[in-house]
Amino acid sequence: MSILGGSRHWFGPAVGAVAITCLLYYFTSGDSAVLGRALVGLILVVVILFMPAGALGLVSGWRHVRRNRATAAAKADASPVGHTVSAPVVRLKTTITAEPLLQVSGLSKSFRGVHALSDVTLEVRKGEILGLIGPNGSGKSTFINLVSGHYKPTRGEIVFEGHNLTGLDAHRFAQAGIARTYQIPRPFSHMTVLENVAMVGMFGGQGKSRAEATRDAQSFIEFAGLEHRAHALPDDLNLHQRKFLELARALAAQPKLLLLDEVLSGLTPSEINEAIEMVQRIRDRGTTIVFVEHVMRAVMALTDRIVVLNHGALIAQGNASDVMNEEGVKAAYLGKAHA
């Protein structure tokens, strides 16, 4: 019901409930009842694909378009000839001047008609921590899966250190120097903490011998504060320790670019503080980081720039404090009525 009416406003579910009730009441029995249920299903599919904000969202969108056109016309009348209206994507001034490490152009990904990512163009600069934020379902994890090679793009290019990696398999991305973590840690359950980290050194693109990989794994485990759990199995670790094991495994690949996908989810405030300090130390080692996270105090503390996605589209990028004050970003998180 909230899908049909819209979930961004309290009145949306009520609109959806009335529409569905009336439709089912009209088709009350026999074949008509089956037809009614089929029509409800078809309507919901159409709404999900073409009206993700629901009926109220569509009406609100029309109102915003009319208001924006009126505002733009008023500004045009008051402005000198030659004045141009700014682009809808916010590109704010930043002090980062390092050369680009990762460049994506027109990156898009669709799943059977559902557009998970649409024409995203951005760059990750060498040595920075770039925050990637947005509401649930905005395309953040899809972006991570694309630039780590786990998904192949529908359109667009992925260039890393000047080399076009578009369409290559995930192990080629790893060999190029891109590593990632997962929202839910995925260690090998039958291997110890030390063995899990050493495995990455042997087969994650470095090609080290078992002895060398084990020696280096010990240092990464110490970096993550897990040296006292080196011979424990993953099932014997708590969530905090499993998250840090995930970081140690990613670091064992010695990446140039590290993609962190919600490493703070499920952690306590004190554990989040430890994780923030660790991410800072990882950057201090010279690793560039893309930081996908919902914990905004961590995003504000760590990132040099942030990029905001919503419904698969890039809607803002720039300095964290400035971007979070943008009306489009507020609308993405809180709904248009609160923007």
Language-model segments: residues:
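Glycine-rich phosphate-binding loops of nucleotide-dependent enzymes
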Residues: I96-Q103, S108-A339
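Short helix-capping/hinge motifs at transmembrane helix termini and TM-loop junctions
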Residues: T28, S32, M51-P52, F203
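Residues at helix-coil transition
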Residues: L4-R8, M51, E222, L334-G335
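ABC-family P-loop ATPase nucleotide-binding domain
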Residues: S60-S108, A337-A339
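Juxtamembrane/interfacial segments flanking transmembrane helices
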Residues: M51-G61
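Short alpha-helical linear motifs
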Residues: C22, R37-I43, R63-V65, F220, ...
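Hydrophobic side chains within well-formed alpha-helices
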Residues: W10-F11, V15, A38, A55, ...
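Transmembrane alpha-helical segments in multi-pass inner-membrane proteins
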Residues: M1-V46
